[in-house]
């Protein structure tokens, strides 16, 4: 039942050197705050790792048209939110799965769908030396903007911006001709003040609070918690901001402030190093000499997501960005974001582990392969 050892030779263990410490410390903080929440988080961890291994055995390079099916299925789910979505905290972002009463947030799987489809389209149409021209750019932009518009309608400005930054960040880094990106950049600068008038009142208030001289209550308490942590942090009993509930949403949106109060400036620097190291490690796959664009785009997309999520969340807790509901990746309490990232890492590890052994188009002899490796090959043929 063992996997062929050659698969493990290409399995990238370094991401887990970064991920495991995040999960351990996150679980500790959540447990200190609430034993009940820590049990739920443990369930999310279990689901995430189970899905990681399930996804690891899916032959993504062979899916082809099925990636379009997955994409459009996610778009349909996003559209259904407008008609039969479940509202919570003033936003309609969830669907209730019949008979089992479990809520699904379609904006999470759609990130995976967009990334896989972009990887597939770029693989079959690699960027020319000078970058993509208007034709290919508009084609790829359609698949990015359609779900982003549906997410924005929910309304969920934060997630919509994440989708746009991931999608267009990939296109910009992969390569666009100057006559494409320069007018787009100018148009963005001109359109930004106009777009402000189309925001919801609560979104305008967040921007106004951010620009005001005095931060709002949530951000103020977050800054106090961060400052009170000192260089080495405090014991659990001495974390007054969290203990006495001054710090809002201490295990979710503002968990960075809770972490710094607990582990201080030194802990914050280590956390920065983990996120920067993980993002750069994934980003550097783009510079591999081979022409495996599917792998490069998936790794680049995950890198952008981790960098943007962590940067925005930390900036938000420091009062350097408007307060939006963006979690700290692989660290904040909750299942949706964590499970999404574990699925993405499962896809990445699949692309790494099986790219040389099977080639997906070759027909090797199966005699020397383990049972599970043969099963993967059979599913992909």
From Swiss-Prot:
Membrane topology: Multi-pass membrane protein
Main subcellular location: membrane
Enzymatic reactions: [GlcNAc-(1->4)-Mur2Ac(oyl-L-Ala-gamma-D-Glu-L-Lys-D-Ala-D-Ala)](n)-di-trans,octa-cis-undecaprenyl diphosphate + beta-D-GlcNAc-(1->4)-Mur2Ac(oyl-L-Ala-gamma-D-Glu-L-Lys-D-Ala-D-Ala)-di-trans,octa-cis-undecaprenyl diphosphate = [GlcNAc-(1->4)-Mur2Ac(oyl-L-Ala-gamma-D-Glu-L-Lys-D-Ala-D-Ala)](n+1)-di-trans,octa-cis-undecaprenyl diphosphate + di-trans,octa-cis-undecaprenyl diphosphate + H(+)
The enzyme's E.C. designation: 2.4.99.28
Keywords (A to Z) from UniProt: Cell inner membrane, Cell membrane, Cell shape, Cell wall biogenesis/degradation, Glycosyltransferase, Membrane, Peptidoglycan synthesis, Transferase, Transmembrane, Transmembrane helix
Compartments, record wording: Cell inner membrane
CC annotations in GO: cell division site; plasma membrane
Transmembrane segments: 11-31, 40-60, 66-86, 99-119, 132-152, 156-176, 180-200, 263-283, 297-317, 328-348
Domain of life: Bacteria
Broadest EC class assigned to this enzyme: transferase
Pathway(s) where this gene product acts: Cell wall biogenesis; peptidoglycan biosynthesis
Short name of one Pfam family: FTSW_RODA_SPOVE
GO molecular function: lipid-linked peptidoglycan transporter activity; peptidoglycan glycosyltransferase activity
GO biological process: cell division; cell wall organization; peptidoglycan biosynthetic process; regulation of cell shape
UniProt function note: Peptidoglycan polymerase that is essential for cell wall elongation.
Similarity-based family: Belongs to the SEDS family. MrdB/RodA subfamily.
The protein's name in its UniProt record: Peptidoglycan glycosyltransferase MrdB
Taxonomic source organism: Helicobacter pylori (strain ATCC 700392 / 26695) (Campylobacter pylori)
């Amino acid at each position: 039942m063992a996997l062929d050892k050659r698969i493990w030779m290409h399995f990238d263990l370094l991401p887990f050197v970064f991920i495991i410490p995040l999960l351990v410390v996150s679980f500790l903080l959540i447990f200190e705050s609430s034993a009940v929440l820590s049990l739920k988080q443990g369930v999310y961890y279990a689901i995430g790792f189970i899905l990681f291994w399930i996804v690891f055995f899916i032959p993504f390079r062979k899916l082809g048209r099925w990636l379009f099916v997955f994409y459009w299925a996610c778009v349909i789910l996003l559209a259904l939110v407008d008609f039969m979505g479940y509202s919570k905290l003033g936003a309609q972002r969830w669907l209730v799965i019949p008979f089992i009463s479990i809520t699904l947030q379609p904006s999470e799987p759609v990130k995976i769908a967009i990334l896989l489809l972009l990887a597939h389209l770029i693989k079959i149409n690699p960027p020319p030396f000078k970058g993509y021209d208007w034709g290919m750019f508009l084609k790829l932009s359609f698949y990015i903007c359609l779900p982003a518009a549906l997410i924005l309608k929910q309304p969920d400005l934060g997630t919509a911006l994440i989708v746009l930054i991931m999608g267009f960040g990939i296109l910009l880094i992969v390569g666009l001709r100057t006559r494409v990106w320069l007018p787009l950049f100018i148009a963005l600068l001109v359109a930004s003040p106009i777009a402000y008038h189309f925001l919801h009142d609560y979104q305008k208030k967040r921007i106004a609070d951010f620009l005001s001289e005095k931060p709002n209550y949530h951000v103020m308490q977050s800054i106090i918690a961060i400052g009170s942590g000192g260089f080495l942090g405090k014991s659990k009993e001495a974390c007054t901001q969290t203990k006495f509930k001054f710090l809002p949403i201490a295990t979710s949106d503002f968990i960075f402030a809770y972490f710094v109060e607990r582990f201080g400036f030194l802990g914050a620097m280590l956390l920065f190093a983990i996120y920067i190291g993980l993002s750069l490690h994934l980003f550097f796959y783009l510079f591999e000499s081979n022409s495996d664009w599917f792998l490069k785009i998936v790794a680049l997309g995950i890198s952008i997501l981790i960098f943007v999520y962590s940067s925005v969340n930390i900036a938000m807790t420091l009062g350097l960005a408007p307060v939006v509901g963006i979690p700290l990746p692989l660290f904040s309490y909750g299942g949706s974001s964590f499970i999404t990232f574990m699925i993405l890492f499962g896809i990445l590890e699949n692309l790494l582990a099986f790219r040389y052994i099977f080639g997906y188009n070759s027909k090797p002899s199966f005699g020397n392969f383990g049972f599970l490796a043969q099963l993967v090959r059979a599913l992909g043929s």
